[in-house]
Amino acid sequence: MSTIRCDIVSAEKEIFHGEATLVVATGELGELGIAPKHAPLITRLKPGKVVVITANGEHLDFAISGGILEVQPQVVTILVDTAVRAQDIEEAAVRKVKEEAERLLANRGNTVDVAEAQRRLTEATVQLQALERLRRNLKH
């Protein structure tokens, strides 16, 4: 089976490095599926999911806060601000962050950084969606 190398990295660390049969990510114009021998491209990624199907068939689900995806003949590189594997997400902590961001946005005052509250809300929502996908996959 043909594979493509996949690297997911942030400014702080390498998050994933391995061979994949398919990489799925949410670009600005919709969902992208990157398979081996895909045409070269570069695009911005929206906050959302990145799913890597490894050479042995394992589905790895990541929640990302946005980034850049680049496809070259032998490698797909995903540069992200933040990324977390669905299985590593602490649901209670994420729900707390989401509720706090929603509260800040609902009670906007002069001291509220709206952009930061919206960023936190988006990031928490993306992580909770990743957890839900993980739970659905575990049921199958």
UniProtKB/Swiss-Prot annotation:
Pfam families: ATP-synt_DE, ATP-synt_DE_N
Disulfide bonds: none
The gene coding this protein: atpC
Entry GO CC: plasma membrane; proton-transporting ATP synthase complex
Stated name of the protein: ATP synthase epsilon chain
Lineage of the organism: Bacteria, Pseudomonadati, Pseudomonadota, Gammaproteobacteria, Lysobacterales
GO MF annotations, alphabetized: ATP binding; proton-transporting ATP synthase activity, rotational mechanism
Subcellular location: Cell inner membrane
Main location: membrane
Function text: Produces ATP from ADP in the presence of a proton gradient across the membrane.
Keywords from the named record: ATP synthesis, Cell inner membrane, Cell membrane, CF(1), Hydrogen ion transport, Ion transport, Membrane, Transport
